[in-house]
């Protein structure tokens, strides 16, 4: 039943997306973009688009004033409502919201927001990712713009503050983050929003309890009070992965092994970073405007979300993306087929065939 509801919402959303550009010219550009970002296994490059020129797509992303903000709003509303539908008959279901920073590595000065952070040169994105059961969505993002701008911690809290009130009331929300977000300001901000958390901490993070020591001196599953955030008692999980030991704290006083299990949930976000960059084209961004970056990320999030809604164990990600495109955007498939026929006209003539087609009134 949940799959049926999710599929229905996805189809409604797909139709809403196609209607957002107001002119037929821009609608064709959007359809070509959807085909491009769902075509996994090939380079996400405007020269690969069908039905429109690379320059037309460049203007569509960088210049034209179509309402991409509305597209973001429609996508996020659909995502939250699909999560709500999935938890319809559950008592106080647990929703996990992961925040993390990833770098789309780039060089040069002509791309927007390129800076150096932690030794990496590129565009640094703080991403909010939602997970409930088998449902996994990238929801929203912020760009970290470097020194003297809002920190990743501040940007992450901004993203969490945008979670709708009706989601907060329906779900028990647990925020997952790595040690890059261990700052007291982040922990306090998460609790102020009414959320629980499991957050990584550095091995040398100091404590007031069980003494003035570091978390590395504290036992797995033990209780700790962090030195610069003594407001709450937390429980500690630790795991040795050979060359390095990792630590995390929980606001719910979970058992040590349960903390580690929650921490492993963050791999869903890590998987999105990998697939988003190398399958859905995030790493291939090369536009020179902030508007172009926002719309590029929008198409990545949209393609990933719709593909994951249709994914099954017996299909590869590439097969699922193509099936999703054809199921939700039949106009895009039709244009693709007509384009292929047009390209093969000369070949058909050489072999004595002539092919024509006409639109039927159904």
Language-model features, listed with the residues they occupy:
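Short secondary-structure boundary/capping segments within folded domains
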Residues: 22, 48-50, 86-89
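Active-site-proximal, Lys/Arg-enriched surface segment
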Residues: 63-133
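Single, function-defining residue in the core of a domain
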Residues: 1-33, 38, 73, 106, ...
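A common structural microfeature
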Residues: 33, 43, 54, 94-98, ...
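Short capping segments at the starts of secondary-structure elements
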Residues: 38-44
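Conserved glycine-centered beta->alpha loop in an early N-terminal alpha/beta scaffold
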Residues: 46, 52-53, 70-71
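Short, basic interhelical loop/turn and adjoining N-cap
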Residues: 49-62
């Amino acid at each position: 039943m949940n799959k049926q509801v999710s599929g229905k919402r996805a189809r409604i959303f797909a139709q809403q997306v196609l209607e957002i550009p107001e002119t037929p010219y821009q609608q064709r550009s959007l359809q070509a973009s959807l085909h491009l970002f769902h075509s996994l296994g090939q380079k996400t490059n405007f020269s690969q688009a069908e039905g429109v020129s690379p320059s037309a797509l460049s203007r569509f992303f960088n210049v034209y004033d179509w309402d991409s903000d509305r597209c973001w709003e429609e996508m996020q509303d659909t995502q939250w409502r699909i999560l709500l539908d999935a938890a319809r008959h559950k008592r106080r279901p647990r929703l996990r919201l992961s925040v993390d920073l990833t770098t789309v590595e780039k060089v040069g000065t002509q791309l927007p927001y390129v800076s150096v952070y932690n030794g990496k040169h590129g565009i640094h994105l703080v991403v909010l990712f939602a997970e409930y059961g088998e449902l996994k969505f990238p929801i929203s993002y912020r760009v970290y713009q470097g020194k003297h701008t809002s920190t990743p911690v501040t940007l992450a809290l901004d993203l969490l503050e945008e979670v709708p009130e009706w989601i907060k009331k329906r779900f028990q929300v647990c925020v997952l983050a790595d040690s890059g977000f261990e700052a007291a300001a982040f922990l306090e901000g998460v609790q102020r929003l009414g959320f629980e958390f499991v957050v990584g901490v550095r091995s040398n993070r100091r404590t007031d309890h069980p003494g003035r020591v570091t978390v590395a001196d504290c036992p797995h599953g033990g209780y700790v009070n962090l030195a610069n955030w003594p407001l709450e008692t937390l429980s500690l999980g630790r795991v040795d992965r050979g060359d390095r030991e990792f630590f995390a704290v929980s606001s719910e006083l979970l058992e040590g092994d349960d903390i580690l299990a929650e921490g492993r949930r963050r791999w869903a976000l890590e998987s999105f970073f990998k697939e988003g960059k190398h399958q859905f084209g995030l790493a291939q961004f090369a536009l020179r405007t902030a508007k172009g970056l926002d719309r590029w990320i929008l198409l990545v999030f949209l393609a990933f979300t719709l593909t994951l809604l249709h994914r099954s164990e017996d299909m590869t990600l590439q097969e699922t993306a193509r099936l999703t495109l054809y199921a939700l955007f039949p106009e895009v498939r039709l244009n693709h087929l007509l384009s292929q026929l047009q390209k093969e006209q000369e070949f058909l003539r050489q072999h004595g065939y002539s092919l024509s087609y006409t639109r039927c009134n159904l």
